[in-house]
Curated annotation (Swiss-Prot):
EC number(s) given by UniProt: 6.3.3.1
GO molecular-function terms, A-Z: ATP binding; phosphoribosylamine-glycine ligase activity; phosphoribosylformylglycinamidine cyclo-ligase activity
Organism superkingdom: Bacteria
Broad class of enzyme this protein falls into: ligase
Protein name: Phosphoribosylformylglycinamidine cyclo-ligase
Length: 352
């Protein structure tokens, strides 16, 4: 097969795709993946598919899967050229969803798409993904890096994550045991986490704030990019030691939209917003965006990243266990009987 001599010889690189850069990235990230390896991994990076043996000791194992991204928090990371923690966010958004069902995360895969591959940026992001997997106790077994010129501007990139976990069928947490009198425990968030960033960026824009301006012990931009807290290990230990009726990951929609997802029809959640500390970052966002407090609570986590619902007689033990595991915890409310004319979530003490 011969090439025509009267036309320039084109390569994939001429079209904007650098195979060598992709290969260099794979070499850079092998260590990050290897550091997360669980004993059940049979084959990880490099193959067409990762192989993972089911952990032993389960009578009726159920696999739980989830996928998520980090939304427009990515734009903030690119704007600040700070890419070392956005991978932690990606893992957190997936594994925190799995633990809500009582599932232990087993393995994780990522998808990284960009217009022009920067090996340094991508390697930094994937190293963060590895750190997130280590925090969650799951293995980074593979992923896809897609260089797509014309689809993304320059070295802009997008991320998606995919995670699979496992839970004993008889121990699935589905909210069916929730009953009036149960206690709601809130686990403190580490910041805005990974939801509401379109509003965050709009507030920064209209307020004229500088991302490099001081904010507490950091800058405003650094405070906004604080990585999402991963709650997996403390919650797995809690589930082993005390009854848990429901868990709710407080993501987009805040307490108002996420608590109803785990409540049976007869139950409503009554949350005292004065029972937990509102981080100053949320006060800053509310003030500078003139955002109604009800809108704040249906957009942001407002300081509570995960809610645990436990029987009243287990509340003290749960608070003690979570605190001993390093979590900042608050007794934020209780479950009451719900009637049709009432909201499913009542925020006591909310003043607009």
């Amino acid at each position: 097969m011969t090439a025509s001599n009267d036309k320039p010889s084109l390569s994939y690189r001429d079209a904007g795709v650098d195979i060598d850069a992709g290969n260099a990235l794979v070499q850079r990230i092998k260590g990050a993946a290897q550091a997360t390896r669980r004993p059940e991994v049979m084959a990880g990076l490099g193959g067409f598919g990762a192989l993972f043996e089911l952990p032993k000791g389960y009578q009726e194992p159920v696999l739980v899967s989830g996928t998520d991204g980090v939304g427009t928090k990515l734009r903030l990371a690119m704007q600040m050229n700070k890419h070392d923690t956005i991978g932690i966010d990606l893992v957190a958004m997936c594994v925190n969803d799995l633990i809500v069902q009582g599932a232990e995360p087993l393995f994780f895969l990522d998808y990284y798409a960009t217009g022009k591959l920067s090996v340094d940026v991508a390697a930094t992001v994937v190293t963060g993904i590895g750190e997130g997997c280590s925090q969650a106790g799951c293995s980074l077994v593979g992923g896809e890096t897609a260089e797509m010129p014309g689809m993304y501007e320059g070295d802009d990139y997008d991320l998606a994550g995919f995670c699979v976990g496992i839970v004993e069928k008889s121990k699935i947490i589905d909210g069916s045991l929730v009953k009036p009198g149960d206690v709601l425990i809130g686990l403190a968030s580490s910041g805005v986490h990974s939801n509401g960033y379109s509003l965050v960026r709009k507030i920064v824009e209209v307020s004229g704030a500088d991302l490099n301006q001081p904010f507490g012990d950091a800058t405003l931009g650094e405070a906004l990019l604080a990585p999402t807290r991963i709650y997996v290990k403390p919650l797995l230990e809690l589930i082993r030691q005390t009854p848990v009726h429901a868990l709710s990951h407080i993501t987009g929609g805040g307490l108002l939209e996420n608590l109803p997802r785990v409540l049976p029809a007869h139950a409503k959640a009554v949350v005292d917003v004065n029972a937990f500390e509102m981080p100053e970052l949320f006060n800053w966002l509310q003030k500078n965006g003139n955002v109604a407090w009800n809108e704040m609570f249906r957009t942001f986590n407002c300081g509570i990243g995960m809610v645990v619902c436990v029987p009243a007689d287990s509340a003290d033990k749960a608070l003690e266990l979570l605190s001993a595991a390093g979590e900042t915890v608050f007794r934020i409310g209780s479950i009451e009987t719900h009637t049709e004319e009432e909201p499913v979530v009542e925020l006591k003490g909310l003043v607009d």
